[in-house]
Amino acid sequence: MTSQLWSSTPWVDSGNTLHKRRVPYIQDATYLHTLDIWQPKSLGGSSLPTADVLPQGKGPWVIYIHGGAWRDPLVDSSSFEATALKLLSYKDTPIAGVASVNYPLSNHPNHPTHPAPPRDSSEPVDIAREAKHPDHIIALLTAISFLQNDLGVSHDYVLSGHSCGATMTFQTVMNPGHWLGTAKGISVPEVKKPRVIAPLNGLYDLAAFINNPPESHKQLQQLYTDFTKNAFGDDEAVWKAVCPTSVADWSTEWPEGKVVVIAQSKGDGLVPYAQTELMKNHLRKTSALEVVEMKASGDHNDLWKQADEIVDIIKCAIGYLAKL
């Protein structure tokens, strides 16, 4: 069955790389239960491999989780394409493959062009945009499990995410009991956790973010409240539990963990830099992890839109992984 999922999408030529677009990682997948994969072209063949050919390269993988406040339909796996192509163009950074994961989104009734549910009640509801926690993180873990257990790749990898994708990066290495809370009967896919992560412009303490934003971001308080409640419901205890700042002892929580390469622009107009300060301080108090801060500039989405700094950050993370 896995081979059918994998083979349902062709390899396409993308310059120096091969690309599979929107590979489904579950049966009966929506368009958001998919991932994109890029891998370097093999030295030997000039023709495109058939759709059933699995990635063969040696070296670590990069798995990326897009942002968008768990709800933005215009930010998806393709947002990492410029970064993936640039990363794979460097011969001095051996990367076996890059995966960028889609996951179901929460509703966004006020989106200016793509509201969900639709404003016109006669239009069909998009079931891929009705997710509630823990749907997002369960989908991500399912995607990583598909890569590792079904395709047999990405056992050694850097996990990176932007904005809410940075939150999900930490959730991946947390004990699921933290973010599952009182949810019953939910099967959590088991994955091999990364040793190095690279969270970018992240949301790490939603309650602090909502209840006490810095003066520079106070005007966004209602926006923060809206997207948090959309994804996680009204219970503030849940907002706290899903966040990495709720972990009392990161050493026991993530024993595999070695390095966190963290970055945020101080000019981020959407997420206050105080979130990164909180997370850095929390990790230093509760773990023996090496916490490395990398330079980032511009506004919230400039990191992935411009690709230069994010490439440097991920290359740095891969460098740390290579030394372990």
What do these predicted regions represent?
Residues 2-57:
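N-terminal cap/lid segment of alpha/beta-hydrolase-fold proteins
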Residues 9-12, 27, 203, 208-251:
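Mobile cap/lid helix-loop segments that gate and shape the active-site cleft of serine hydrolases
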Residues 41-93:
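Short, surface-exposed "cap/lid" segments of acyl-processing enzymes
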Residues 68, 99-109, 203, 298-299:
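Short beta-to-alpha linker loops that shape the active-site pocket of alpha/beta-hydrolase fold enzymes
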Residues 87-112, 117-120:
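Conserved alpha/beta-hydrolase
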Residues 114-151:
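Alpha/beta-hydrolase active-site loop
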Residues 142-213:
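Primarily recognizes the serine-hydrolase "nucleophile elbow" in alpha/beta-hydrolase
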Residues 263, 267-324:
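C-terminal catalytic histidine-bearing segment of alpha/beta-hydrolase fold enzymes
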